[in-house]
């Protein structure tokens, strides 16, 4: 072995318009997920001259950041946490369930309209309370490559086990994702 590793690309850009990447994160608290997705989008569009990126985020601050070249942004309704740590709807109003259904539809319709070669999901394997499941299932059925990205430390092991110990999360981690990236 000569020390050089050869990796086979797991995606092939379309010859007509280059690589298209959709980056999703629920972004209910803080700026870390959005900033990470902005950095990833910038790196992709700089590395591939014909690439384009679409960021889908619930961050209330999303429109205050400069977007990298060839990158656009879909702002879904914000969800935050109350003083008890429970998710609540933002200015969209209505119930949390109604807001999550609306966000889920926006994520799915963005996927359909943008038609990405690759989806990168940040932090929550199925999105906030499963809001990305319909998109993940359709993307998987269509042969879209799907990556999951996460920080090296998410929360305490007990909290992660509690949050991720369900059938949808197991499906996403074991069958849906083509790659899992730890940042």
Task: Please report, for each region that a protein language model flagged, where it lies by residue.
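Conserved nucleotide-sugar phosphate-binding/catalytic loop shared by glycosyltransferases and other
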Residues: 17-19, 25, 43, 47-98, ...
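A short, glycine/small-residue-rich beta-strand->loop->alpha-helix junction that serves as a flexible
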Residues: 25-38, 61-62
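An aromatic- and histidine-rich active-site surface loop
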Residues: 61-63, 120-138
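Active-site-proximal region of nucleotide-activated glycan assembly enzymes
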Residues: 135-183
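Conserved nucleotide-sugar donor-binding subdomain of glycosyltransferases
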Residues: 89-128
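Structural motif
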Residues: 20, 117-118, 179
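Histidine-anchored nucleotide/phosphate-binding helix
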Residues: 34-45, 133-139
């Amino acid at each position: 072995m000569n020390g050089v590793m050869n990796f086979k690309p797991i995606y092939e850009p379309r010859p007509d318009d280059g690589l298209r990447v959709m980056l999703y994160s629920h972004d209910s608290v803080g700026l870390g997920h959005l900033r990470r997705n902005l950095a990833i989008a910038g790196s992709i569009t700089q590395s591939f001259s014909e690439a384009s990126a679409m960021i889908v985020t619930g961050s209330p601050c999303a429109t205050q950041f400069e977007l990298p070249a060839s990158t656009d942004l879909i702002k879904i309704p914000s969800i935050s946490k109350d003083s008890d740590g429970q998710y609540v709807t933002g200015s969209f109003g209505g119930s949390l369930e109604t807001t999550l259904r609306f966000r889920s539809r926006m994520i799915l319709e963005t996927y359909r309209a943008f038609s990405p070669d690759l989806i990168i999901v940040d932090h929550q394997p199925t999105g906030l309370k499963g809001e990305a499941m319909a998109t993940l299932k359709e993307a998987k059925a269509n042969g879209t490559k799907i990556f999951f990205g996460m920080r090296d430390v998410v929360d305490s092991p007990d909290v992660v086990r509690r949050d991720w110990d369900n059938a949808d999360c197991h499906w996403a981690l074991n069958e849906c994702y083509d790659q899992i990236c730890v940042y």
